Amino acid sequence: MLNIFSLICICLHSTLYSSSFFLAKLPEAYAFLNPIVDFMPVIPLLFFLLAFVWQAAVSFR
């Protein structure tokens, strides 16, 4: 359990303190991918929530 908590903290730390990474712009040739790139940081959180939904579906066995 501690390892999972540590991993979450590391992910949040790197996300919160790398704001300059989010301010970078894609090259013009890839500008059409902007909506997808904006959504990409949220994808790991969706997998995290999916784990809880899955466990609820099997009654937290």
Swiss-Prot record:
Keyword Membrane applies: yes
Pfam families the record matches: PsbK
Propeptide: 1-24
Disulfide bonds: none
GO cellular component: chloroplast thylakoid membrane; photosystem II reaction center
UniProt cross-references to InterPro entries, sorted A to Z: PSII_PsbK, PSII_PsbK_sf
Transmembrane segments: 36-56
Subcellular location: Plastid, Chloroplast thylakoid membrane
Coiled-coil region: none
Keywords assigned: Chloroplast, Membrane, Photosynthesis, Photosystem II, Plastid, Reaction center, Thylakoid, Transmembrane, Transmembrane helix
Gene Ontology biological-process annotations: photosynthesis
Topology of this chain in the membrane: Single-pass membrane protein
Top-level taxon of origin: Eukaryota
Reported function: One of the components of the core complex of photosystem II (PSII). PSII is a light-driven water:plastoquinone oxidoreductase that uses light energy to abstract electrons from H(2)O, generating O(2) and a proton gradient subsequently used for ATP formation. It consists of a core antenna complex that captures photons, and an electron transfer chain that converts photonic excitation into a charge separation.
Subunit structure: PSII is composed of 1 copy each of membrane proteins PsbA, PsbB, PsbC, PsbD, PsbE, PsbF, PsbH, PsbI, PsbJ, PsbK, PsbL, PsbM, PsbT, PsbX, PsbY, PsbZ, Psb30/Ycf12, at least 3 peripheral proteins of the oxygen-evolving complex and a large number of cofactors. It forms dimeric complexes.
Protein family: Belongs to the PsbK family.
PANTHER family: PHOTOSYSTEM II REACTION CENTER PROTEIN K, PTHR35325
Record-given protein name: Photosystem II reaction center protein K
Species for this entry: Eucalyptus globulus subsp. globulus
Recorded name of the encoding gene: psbK
